[in-house]
């Protein structure tokens, strides 16, 4: 039996920063925006997002349907869910460590349409991000 993958430095930084940023989000979409702003700065996730032109600020107006308060619940649960899915992504790659790209894949899975909307506002989409990461379509 092989050891469970552990976060590399970039993934640990992303998860740590998210743990301090998420409590200030008013909705799941705002949480997704915070994840994106963090992920674009670290590791393979950052390289993929920046190569797609994802910048600090959104290309489109961000206002609108943030669903304030709806779903911005227990940050510990969402961090645990993202961490668990990231570990599975790393295991799927046969990697000994969880990379920032695995965290990005996990955020895409856990946040679903909320993260898809955030990606669109930044001028990209799930398929482009996963392709840039070298992950099968999801």
Predicted stretch roles:
Residues 1-138:
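Histone-fold recognition with a strong bias for associated Lys/Arg-rich disordered tails
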């Amino acid at each position: 039996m092989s050891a469970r993958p552990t976060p590399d430095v970039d993934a640990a930084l992303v998860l740590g920063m998210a743990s301090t940023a998420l409590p200030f989000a008013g909705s799941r979409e705002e949480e997704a925006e915070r994840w994106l702003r963090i992920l674009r700065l670290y590791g393979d996730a950052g390289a993929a997002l920046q190569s797609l032109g994802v910048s600090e600020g959104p290309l489109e107006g961000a206002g609108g349907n943030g669903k304030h308060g709806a779903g911005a619940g227990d940050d510990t649960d969402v961090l645990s869910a993202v961490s668990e899915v990231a570990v599975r992504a790393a295991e799927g790659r046969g990697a000994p460590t969880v990379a920032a790209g695995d965290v990005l894949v996990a955020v895409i899975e856990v946040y679903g349409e909320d993260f898809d909307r955030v990606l669109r506002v930044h001028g990209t989409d799930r398929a482009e991000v996963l392709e840039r990461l070298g992950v099968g379509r999801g």
